[in-house]
Amino acid sequence: IEQIEEFMPLLINGSYPKIKQDHSKSNIWRKRNKSDGLIDWRMSADSIHNTVRALSKPYIGAEFIHNDVNYKLWETEIIKNNNKNIEPGKVLKIVDSDLPIIKCGINAIKIIESEPKLEVKKGTYI
């Protein structure tokens, strides 16, 4: 709070010191596009989860295609799963009556919210 109390008067009266950006230390990133949110189940569960979080509402959403249907993922949870003998993309189990857990390159992901709702059976590959 002290920092805000010190900063606000300087900002309001225009006396806050301005520092020019050193462009030799800056970088430019292209505009995000649809391909940035494509889910590859060979990715780690951490990477998939972070992609979903980064692109969740109000953004475009992370997505994957299953049976010619485009699914957007809005919420996921990382599930620890060290079984290396299962290929990424396999539905390991269904929990809470309708939430699939899908094997990733490392660990697994529970899909909590998708659009449309993903309805799959255990053992299915996505």
Regions found by a protein language model. Name each.
Residues 30-43:
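Acyl-group handling in specialized metabolite and lipid biosynthesis
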Residues 1-19:
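Conserved anion/nucleotide-ligand pocket segment
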Residues 1, 5, 25, 45, ...:
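A general structural signal for well-ordered alpha-helical packing
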Residues 4, 11, 36-39, 51:
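Structural signature of PLP-dependent enzymes
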Residues 19-28:
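Anionic-ligand binding region
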Residues 41-126:
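An anion-binding loop in the catalytic cleft
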Residues 29-32, 103-105:
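Short, flexible turn/loop "capping" segments at secondary-structure junctions
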